[in-house]
Amino acid sequence: MPKANNAVASKARRKRVLKKAKGFWGSRGNILTVVKHAVDKAEQYAYRDRRVKKRTFRSLWIMRINAAARLNGTTYSRMINAMLKKNVEIDRKALAEIAVKDPAAFTVIVKSLFE
């Protein structure tokens, strides 16, 4: 008796993997064994970079705050220290947004910290 391979499930599985590889170049997008490796690696990078993104954005916010602080005659570290001493609880994301979108308001914040 011939072996039943369950073609429906096999085809669905292949289709699912190939769908994840849409847009991949060359054999990475159409040869199943290569596609499996490419998709696995892509998912590893995606997992890692979801975490790296948080670090990258925090770093960007700090750079923006530091640049704006230096325009106002202080530095990032002095400003954060003053915020801690005065119990000002504005997070870095919001501070960076204020620094970019409304420099006048940022200047007011800096002056209030060093009074």
Curated annotation (Swiss-Prot):
Pfam families: Ribosomal_L20 (PF00453). One of its GO terms (molecular function) is rRNA binding. SUPFAM superfamilies: Ribosomal protein L20 (SSF74731). Binds directly to 23S ribosomal RNA and is necessary for the in vitro assembly process of the 50S ribosomal subunit. It is not involved in the protein synthesizing functions of that subunit. Keywords: Ribonucleoprotein, Ribosomal protein, RNA-binding, rRNA-binding. Belongs to the bacterial ribosomal protein bL20 family. It comes from Pelodictyon phaeoclathratiforme (strain DSM 5477 / BU-1). This is Large ribosomal subunit protein bL20.
